[in-house]
């Protein structure tokens, strides 16, 4: 059964399919006019088509399902009972308030309880949610909740550190400012030493 988040993604995907490429390009052409440009000049003739194509790629997460990525897990762990940590998962996203890029890295750790997953699938889960309009807080919770649902680990930790271009390019214009969000569950929620070890491994060792 799909989660509420996945159901919303499906509904949005259906809405997108009902829009023709011509309608999307027309909207982009209108935007070019609004900012004061001439969409008929040589350099902009193909711009609406290019933007439509790149947006389909940048927001591909609306057409992807975490169920398909995490639907298959492995139950043979050969007695391994220590944390699995995947760090420095680079991603780019876009803030839902200004549609300006968010660029950052995600770090994930989980303490298996008879279930493990291919390491690349953790990175793919990050990408699914990154390729949607986001707030960093929501994305952190979505990644954590998805892994928790399918792996049912004894402990789970997710840390995302990112620079928001909406803070660097406009408004206060503070380039280089990093935002850090975390989500701890189970063992990592209860054990402060485990939390500290996770923070040291993901942020303290380079």
UniProtKB/Swiss-Prot annotation:
GO terms for cellular component: cytoplasm. The gene is folE. Keywords: GTP-binding, Hydrolase, Metal-binding, Nucleotide-binding, One-carbon metabolism, Zinc. Zn(2+) binds at residues 95, 98, 166. InterPro entries: GTP-CH-I_C/QueF, GTP-CH-I_N, GTP_CycHdrlase_I, GTP_CycHdrlase_I_CS, GTP_CycHdrlase_I_dom. One of its GO terms (biological process) is one-carbon metabolic process. Pfam families: GTP_cyclohydroI. This is GTP cyclohydrolase 1. One of its GO terms (molecular function) is zinc ion binding. Signal peptide: none annotated. Pathway: Cofactor biosynthesis; 7,8-dihydroneopterin triphosphate biosynthesis; 7,8-dihydroneopterin triphosphate from GTP: step 1/1. SUPFAM superfamilies: Tetrahydrobiopterin biosynthesis enzymes-like. Toroid-shaped homodecamer, composed of two pentamers of five dimers. PANTHER family: GTP CYCLOHYDROLASE 1, GTP CYCLOHYDROLASE I. Its EC number is 3.5.4.16. It catalyses: GTP + H2O = 7,8-dihydroneopterin 3'-triphosphate + formate + H(+). Belongs to the GTP cyclohydrolase I family.
């Amino acid at each position: 059964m799909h989660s509420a988040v996945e159901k919303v993604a499906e509904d949005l995907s259906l809405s997108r399919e009902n829009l023709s490429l011509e309608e999307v390009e027309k909207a982009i052409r209108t935007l070019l006019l609004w900012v004061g440009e001439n969409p008929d000049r040589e350099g902009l003739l193909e711009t609406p088509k290019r933007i439509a194509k790149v947006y389909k790629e940048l927001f591909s997460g609306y057409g992807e399902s975490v169920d398909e990525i995490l639907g298959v897990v492995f139950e043979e762990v050969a007695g391994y009972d220590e944390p699995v940590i995947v760090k420095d998962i680079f991603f780019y996203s876009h803030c839902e308030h200004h549609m300006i890029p968010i660029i950052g890295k995600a770090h994930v750790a989980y303490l298996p309880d008879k279930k493990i997953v291919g390491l690349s699938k953790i990175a793919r889960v990050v990408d699914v949610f990154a390729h949607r309009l986001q707030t960093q807080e929501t994305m952190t919770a979505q990644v954590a909740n998805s892994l928790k649902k399918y792996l049912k680990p004894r402990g789970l930790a997710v840390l995302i550190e990112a620079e928001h271009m909406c803070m660097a390019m406009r408004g206060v214009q503070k380039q280089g400012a990093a935002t850090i969000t975390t989500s701890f569950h189970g063992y990592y929620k209860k054990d402060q030493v485990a939390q500290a070890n996770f923070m040291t491994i993901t942020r303290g060792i380079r």
